[in-house]
Structures are given as structure tokens and as C-alpha cells.
Amino acid sequence: MRYLVTGATGFIGRRMLRHLTDGGHDVTALVRAIPALPGVRTAYGDLATGAGLLAAVQGVDRVIHLAGVTKAPSHHLYDRVNAEGTRRLCAALAALPEPPRLVHCSSLAAAGPGRQRREEEEPAPVSAYGRSKLGGEHALREVAHRVPGVIVRPPIVYGPGDREFLPRLVTAVRTGLLPAIGRRGPRHYSLIHVDDLCQALLTAADSGAPGAIYHVSDGTEHLWADIGAAVAAVLGRRAPRVVHIPGGVAVAAARVFGRGSVLNPDKVAEALHPAWTSAPGRLPFTPEITLPEGLRAALTA
């Protein structure tokens, strides 16, 4: 099978390349520069401008769309990449005589917060990031009459190569304090290991129904305190104490630090909600990596 992967140099993208090459597939990575990506071809394409996209999508059977930004200085940049970039890719695919199947890696942020969120529920994103990812989903629907597209919404993704979620947790464990923004009480999150996500995306590529949205996770609602304790167990430290930060304080601090920082208005808008979990989805996919297993592999490698 011939695959084109966008976002191939990112955290999820590099793992996806490994899964595809290990599976014996013919893989092309869409890039703006030409990095060293062993075992795959590269094709120039710029989602921000559309340059090179039509040539890059020629002759492929599947497109795995992973490109996107998770932190940006303004909502315009989120939209430019996550929504408009996806729209440009969709337009290039729709221009082909026989468009390939497209799997779009969206986010649970596009659905919005809550416990056991289901695919059929009305989306209610609370951040610029979530709204931009929902915009990318709309781009797929605009070409659904031409392009057989499938949307996958993962929650928090972790694993080897993660430079955002796990490093922050490790820092929290080492300080002994695990911040929780907003009102007191339990906080629930869905997670998925990057390798399980790759398998879910490939399952969607093979057997997902065109036009469908699929929520994927490791199948467990994790308490925030338990996540911190699991990281501590791998590091041989005491479980960190959950420290609640009032929402007003966090919002004020985020305005000072700005959108480009770890503590930014977008992240605070999401963190104020005590639950981000999804119900077991309709995709015929079974996660294999538990949180303790995934953390052990990622943090002791």
C-alpha cells in the first residue's frame, strides 16, 4: 500500500513512519524541507500555502494527515495550519480523478470537555486549538462527495518522543506538586499511547466508514492524581500532591505569559474543565498498551 504522511517529522508522525515501514508499505513523507527520514521518500508540500500539494498526493492509496500545531501565538496561526491547511490538502485530493482514502487525526479538543464523550454528540470546543481542529473536520466534510475521509479524535497522546505532556509530568513529580487548575475535586482524562494511536489510525485507513468520526483511547478514565502517581512509580519517587490553582489566578498568569508559553490562555481554557474523556468508540480497534506499561517504556528508554 502506498501511503502519504503529513506531519511526518513530529512526535506522532515519526512513530507512524516506523509502523508503516515495519509493515512493508511504500511511504512518502510530506515535508517543507528535506530532513533525513530513513526508509521513506519525501515530497515537498506546504499546507500553509498549498504549494506542491497537488503533485505530492499523486499516486498514493492512503493519506494519514497528522500535521498541525498544538501551541500558537494567536488563533490565526491555529486556523492557518489546523483548519486552512487541512482544507488545502482536501482540495488537492478532491482534484484527483480517483482520490485516495484520507485519515484525519483531529483531537478530542474538537469535541469539547466532558465525561464519556461520544462521537455523535454535538461538538463544543472551548479553546482556539479545539475550534481549529473542528475547522479541519469541516474541511473534510466539504469534500466528502469526492474524498473518502475518516476522522479520528485522540485524547492526550504520550509515549517515546513526547516533548509536551510527559516532560511536564516528570517535572511535577520531581517537585512533588501536581498542578490542577480550577475548582477542587477529581479530574478525569483519557489517554492513548502513541503506538496504539498509530494502530488506530491504520485501522481507520483500512476499515473506517467514509464520513465517520471515531474516538479512540486506552479504554480507561484516568484520575489526574493517579496519572501523577503512575509517573512517580516509574521514577522511583513519591506520588506528587495535587495542588489546586484557582481559575482566576491561572487566567491572569496565562495573559502575562502569552500563547506561546506552556501556561497560555488556550491551555487554561481547557484545564478549567475537570473531565476530558471519551466513551469506547465504534472503531474496531483494541488498545494494547496500559498506562504503567507505556510510561515505563517511555521514561526508561
Identify the role of each PLM range.
Residues 3-23:
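N-terminal Rossmann NAD(P)H-binding glycine-rich loop of SDR-like oxidoreductase domains
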Residues 124-150:
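Active-site Tyr-X1-5-Lys
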Residues 87-128:
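Conserved Rossmann-fold NAD(P)-dependent oxidoreductase catalytic core, especially the SDR/UDP-sugar
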Residues 277-301:
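Amphipathic terminal alpha-helices
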Residues 44-87, 108-113:
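NAD(P)H-binding glycine-rich loop region in Rossmannoid oxidoreductase-like domains
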Residues 203-262, 291-299:
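Mid/C-terminal beta-alpha module of Rossmann-like enzyme folds, strongest
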Residues 247-286:
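A hydrophobic C-terminal alpha-helical subdomain
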Residues 163-168, 182-205, 211-212:
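Substrate-positioning beta->alpha
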